[in-house]
């Protein structure tokens, strides 16, 4: 065998291998998609319940309820670090 024949066989083998890999990957993609369709058909996502209306939040300038919470947090922090 001369160099041209070896090079030709090398290219043939390379393209044959790449073709097998491409075919396998295409089959793998089809299998994954078909499994996804089957799973979604037999086990559909549960319908989400409507969320209850959000409660109205306290106004931003209402610090009368936050002052005792902040004072308690500061007291707790100082007690732990002393």
Curated annotation (Swiss-Prot):
CC cofactor: Na(+)
InterPro entries named among the record's database cross-references: Na_pump_deCOase, OadG
GO cellular component: plasma membrane
Molecular function GO labels: decarboxylation-driven active transmembrane transporter activity; oxaloacetate decarboxylase activity; sodium ion transmembrane transporter activity
Keywords from the named record: Cell membrane, Ion transport, Membrane, Sodium, Sodium transport, Translocase, Transmembrane, Transmembrane helix, Transport
Protein transport recorded as keyword: no
Reactions this protein catalyses: oxaloacetate + 2 Na(+)(in) + H(+) = pyruvate + 2 Na(+)(out) + CO2
Intrachain disulfide bonds: none
Transmembrane segments: 12-32
Family label: Belongs to the OadG family.
Function: Catalyzes the decarboxylation of oxaloacetate coupled to Na(+) translocation.
Quaternary organization: Heterotrimer of an alpha, a beta and a gamma subunit.
Protein name per its UniProtKB record: Probable oxaloacetate decarboxylase gamma chain
């Amino acid at each position: 065998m001369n160099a041209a024949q070896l090079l030709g066989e090398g290219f043939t083998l390379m393209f044959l291998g790449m073709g097998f890999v491409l075919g396998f990957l295409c089959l793998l993609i089809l299998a994954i998609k078909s499994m996804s369709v089957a799973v979604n058909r037999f086990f559909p996502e549960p319908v989400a319940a409507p969320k209850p209306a959000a409660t109205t939040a306290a106004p931003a300038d209402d610090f009368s309820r936050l002052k005792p919470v902040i004072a308690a947090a500061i007291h707790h922090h100082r007690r732990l670090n002393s």
